[in-house]
Amino acid sequence: WSKIKSNISEIGVTQTSFLVTILALVLNRWSSNSEFTINLTTMNRPKEYIKSDVVNDFTSTELLEFRMESLQPFYVLLKHIQQQMIEDLQHETFTGVEVTREVRKNVERRDAIFPFVFTSALGIKASEYKYISLQKEGLSETPQVLMDCQVMEVNHELIINFDLRADAFSKELSNSIAEDYSNLLNCFFDLEYFKKTLTEMYDENEMNDVLADKSD
């Protein structure tokens, strides 16, 4: 993870934008849609609490739109998502929840949902993580959420948890999604992999070659 973090820094993007884009790659691989939205959950601690010991729910949501182009190099997509996140932060008071409400005001989009969630706790104390972690009982009580990919760093190691609705995904598919995420992530120990197109990334032989080089 330390090597991957170094490469992320070299590209000039944040760890959160990188990891949520990896999720987009996985979803695109298993989906017939090349355009979709991920509901990004982040910690948004108000400035007046930054240096305090106050523990509370400071979560914020942002709807990230992805348009996956098969011949597009990954680093180009990554830079675009990074810029999109920066621009969205300028409107952080208008949260993803409020955007969803506005979308549903359209009669044709009344049932619109954004069921794929990415929860980033990077940079958050472990004691605070429980406030932004969507537990299994939360998923069972929130039918509009099908998946929550949660990431955090503990003792310099990246922890990834896929919280999936049991009635929405087969066990085989759930395992495949988690495995794809892990395999794709590990490929980025090689800085050159950021230059791969999405089509090349979805090539299992290409991925296996990179992973084999990593293990050598």
Tell where the protein language model's regions lie, with residue ranges.
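Flexible, P/S/T/G-rich "lid" or insertion loops adjacent to the active sites of thioester-utilizing
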Residues: 1-13, 104, 201-208
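Short amphipathic alpha-helical segments
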Residues: 2, 60, 64, 158-160
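His-Asp-centered acyl/peptidyl-transfer active-site segments
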Residues: 7-20, 30-136, 166-170, 194
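Hydrophobic pocket-lining residues that define ligand/cofactor binding sites across diverse proteins
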Residues: 8, 27, 188
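Extended, hydrophobic beta-loop-alpha segments that form or line the acyl/peptidyl-thioester binding
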Residues: 34-41, 69-78, 96, 139-202
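N-lobe entry segment of adenylate-forming
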Residues: 182, 201-216
